[in-house]
Amino acid sequence: EVDDRGATLTSNEGATIRAKHLVMAAGYASQQFLRKRVAKNRSSYAFITEPIDAQTLGTLKDTMVWESARPYLYMRTTGDGRLLVGGDDDSVDIPARRDALVDRKARKLADKVSKLFPGVPVEPAFAWAGTFAETKDGLPWIGASPEHGRRLLFAMAYGGNGITYSMLGAGLIRALVERRKHSLQALFGFER
């Protein structure tokens, strides 16, 4: 329970915790506490090859590639000479359906790499997929939501920049608790 004086939480064992502020930083699960949908789940695909000798890899041996086309492609080598390739994100949000696409998506990614680097043998040895969330504008949602008041603060940093946004968000959350202005409040807050 959250009101204008603070938050009261009760554990499954019956213990009560009272606080002046509650910070909800529960990853994707935070969405369930908001009526407004602030992020959408998506799926990303990746595979890794068996080791490829350094001569065949050529300049790829020490290169990270990010093709910014949509859908994007990224790849890098591992210490033992494998190619780690990923991308081809889609809007599939059901794990079983996503997992059924893994082999086809890996093949599609491998074909794309082969076209870009025809001299490099690209055969997926192991492929996988994962779910991530992204916001419409690519920015995190950090701060108080109008539906819960200023005592419940959310820190929802999604996507590939989540760790960076979480660090920035920590400073913003602290400023909000201390009732100070913060330069990122308008950019990351629920008022946008």
Tell where the protein language model's regions lie, with residue ranges.
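C-terminal catalytic lobe of FAD-dependent flavoproteins
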Residues: 91-99, 111-192
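Short acidic-glycine loop/turn motifs at beta-strand connectors
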Residues: 78-81, 148
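Flavin-dependent oxidoreductases
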Residues: 1-78
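Secondary-structure transition/turn motif
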Residues: 11-15, 87-90, 158
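Short hydrophobic-aromatic micro-motifs
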Residues: 24, 83-86
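Hydrophobic residues embedded in beta-strands of well-ordered beta-sheets
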Residues: 7, 82-83, 151-153
